[in-house]
Each structure stands twice: as structure tokens, then as C-alpha cells.
């Protein structure tokens, strides 16, 4: 190794030296794994990243996904630019990853040998738990969590929950909705059944969505702005950055109107839809936290 980001094949001699070096630094568990690799029938590969550049190869891409799922890097804190162009579309089966071009032949061969070759997915990303099972989590349907998801200890993901790569939860959360790419949910926040967060891959632009502590997205709700702490979005309400929001004080009196993006990141907000007028409303017991002087529309406030 002579510096930079490199991918190197390791023979038995190199693995022996690696195991010895790991043992000397106190990494006994990794040293034991390196020793096991010496008996593999597959080529052992070491991927070294000195710089956080965009992944230039499949091993570099998968290493970064592993760093996320091992909780060594939080979402949006490593460069994943161009990852889709680097990774290949693969059939993920009960016999491991199979090249799409070889899949039909492998299926026929399995039938001839009276074996079952089950294709779990055809994707660039495998399910996380085939490679990483973080401590202290519950995942009801493991196929709905991709490798590269960051799942904090104490998180429960129910059957309808989904977590994309480069997204996830900080700690204790109940996930029954979709956490899209780039979205990070802080501790104590819950996503109700069928709820959705807007990511940066499809339609979300470059707005990175963060959900603060102790928030709730109601069932079938949607979120396109970052939330501060202790916020609630009522069931069935989808908020985008351009949604016009009527602001109410703690006496339910209208104090102004603004776009939802102006409320991004603010604490103690409740978003709801008026069932009579259809207007999207925002309430808080801390009216000053709305910071109305930043709103683009003129408003009059009596406090």
C-alpha cells in the first residue's frame, strides 16, 4: 500500500501478515477473521480509503455502505456521489449474488440438480441483514432495509417500514413508514403507518430532511421539510416546501401565512389540515419560535 484509495487482492501470505498486524494492535476479533479468510475459495480483497472521494469501484462503494450500516458513519457524512453508476444490478439469491447474465443458466442448473434457487431481489443493493445486523434493533421484514441504512440501537422497524441506504435513525424510534435516501430521524421520533419522507433521489431536490427528537409523522402523512424537535404532522397530511401554511397562535387565531420551508427546523410545531376549509394550519404554544419576521409574506402578529 502506497497511499490513496486502493483495492488490493490478498493472497495467503498477505492475510497472514494482516492477521499478525491486527493481533499486535489489539484487534483480536479482526485478526481471527483474517485467519479465516486464508481458507476461503474466493479471492480476498482489502479496500483502503484514505480520502472521502466519490466511490470509484464496486469495493469502494460497498465499503461505504458497510460503514453506514455498522454505525461508523452517519448518513450524509460520506461521499456517495455516483454510487448508482458504480454498482452493478445483481440478482441476490439464497446462493449469494449472481450476475444477471448468468441467472437463467444458474436457475436451470439448480432445477436439474433438484435444488431451489430463490431470487430475493434484483437490485444494486442487498438487504442489510445479509451482511450487517446492528445490535439492539428489531426488523419485522428484513427485505425492506437496504445495506447502507443506519439503524440506531433501540429502533423497531415494522412490516411496512422501509429504510433506504444513506438514511436511518439515531436511536429509539418506531418506523412504520418510509425513510428515504438522505433522511435522518433523531431519537424518540416515530413514523406512522404509510408515512413518507421526501429524499434527494426522486423529486426531493437537494433539500436534506432531518426529523428532530420526539416527533411524530401520522399515518399516511408526508414530509418535505426538515423538522425541529417535538413536532407533529397529522395523519394524511403531506407537507412540501412550497405548501402554504396558515399560522395560528395558542388561541387558534390566525396570525399570518407562509410557505412551509420558512418553518423548517423549528421546534414544537403541530401541522394539521382544517377539515372544513382544507387549509394547512400550524399551531404552537411557543408562537415566537415560528419567527414570523422571516416569512416572505406580510403578517400582523399580536402577542
Task: Say what each PLM segment does.
Residues 80-84, 158, 172-174:
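Short, surface-exposed recognition loops or helix-turn segments adjacent to catalytic cores
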Residues 1-130, 262-303:
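Terminal amphipathic alpha-helical/low-complexity segments used for targeting or macromolecular assembly
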Residues 180, 184-187, 191-303:
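Glycine-rich hexapeptide-repeat left-handed beta-helix
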Residues 61-64, 135, 229:
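General structural feature for long, well-ordered alpha-helical segments within catalytic domains
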